[in-house]
Amino acid sequence: MRLILLLSLFVVAFAAELPLAEECDETKCLLPRCRCSSTNIPGGLAPRDVPQFVSVTFDDAVNVINIETYREVLYGRSNSNGCPAGATFYVSHEYTNYVLVNELYNRGYEVSLHSMTHQTPQTYWAEADYDVLVKEFADQKSLMSHFALIPDQEIRGVRLPFLQMNGNASFQMMADSGLVYDNSWPTVSHVNPGLWPYTLDYASIHDCIVPPCPSASIPGPWVIPMISWSDLNGSPCSMADSCYFTPPLDDENAWYNFILTNFERHYHGNRAPFGFYIHEWYLAVNPAVKAALVRFMNYVNNLNDAFMVNANQIIEWVQNPIPVSEYIRRPCRRFSSTPCRATSCGPLRSEHNGLDYWMQVCNTCPRVYPWLGNPLGR
C-alpha cells in the first residue's frame, strides 16, 4: 500500500512539473527545433514547389509470414530521383523475428516502436503512467537495438497501440529517451489543407480524436499527424484497413482509384505528407488491395515531385524545407548496414505468462523471454 501511495505521489508530482502549453508564438518558435501546429507549408513555399511525401507504414510484429509481403511490394523500389523508396515499420515485440527486422533495416527501411506488449484493454494505454511507458517504449528501443543490431540513434519513432493517445506522459518519455517523433495522432479537422508535422513547445490546434491528448509544453518530440482518409461515404478513417465504406475488396481498379483520390487531396492541396497506414494482414487476405497498393506505389515512384520516404525523412525536410527542384538533387540517404549472425533461441520461458517462446536474434540468446522490466531477458 505504501509503495502504491509513493508511486501515485510521483505521478502527481511529475504531472505538476510540466508547464501548460501556451498559444504558439511564430516569432519564437523557429525551425529547426520548433514549429507551430499549422496547415501552413514549412518555409513559406508554394505548393507546386513542395515535394509530396508519401509515408507507407506497417504495424505490429515482423515474422516469416508477413516478410514475404514486404519483400514483394517494397524491395527494389526507387523514387524518380534515383534514391531508394522508403517505408516505416512500427514493430511490436511479441512474436517478432529480429533477424528479419535487421533485414528490413539493412534494406534502408525505418524501424520504429509499437510497444513491448501491445496489450489490451485499450484503456491500459490511455492510463499508462510515465514509468510504464518507459518500460513499453524506451526499453523496447534497447531491446530492438540489441537483438536486431540496429544502432540506438537510428530508432526514432513511436506509434501507440490502437492509436490511443496518452496525454503528456508519452511525449515526456520520448523527450527523455531520445525519440524524435510520434505518428499516432489522427486528425479529421485538418485534412484539406492538411496539418503539417510540428512540435509541442506550444499549444496544438490538433483535434483530439482519441483522448487524452497532450496539454503541456514539451520541447523536443515532433508530431507527424495521421491525416485521415475519406471513405466512399465521406467518413474519416485513420488507417486504410479501418475504412468502413470501401470499394469491393476484390476490385483492384476501384481500390486504386480510392487510394488515388485520397492522395490527390494532398497532392493538389498544400502537399502535407500523405500516409498509407496499414496492417500487412489486410493485404494478405485481399490480393486486389495489395495489387492496388503496388500500382499506386508505381505511380508515385514515377512522379517527379512525389517521394516515398521513411517517416524521419519527413521531419528532416520540415526542419530544413527546400524546394523540390533542390530536393531532387540532394544525395540519397546514407546509413551503415549491420551484418546479422542469425541465432535461433528457445524454448525461452516467459516470466509474465509462463509460456515458452522461440526467438530469432542477431547475437547471443537471452536467458528468458524479454518482457516489461527485463528487455534483454537477463
Feature locations, PLM:
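Aromatic-lined glycan-binding groove of carbohydrate-active enzymes
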Residues: 197-266
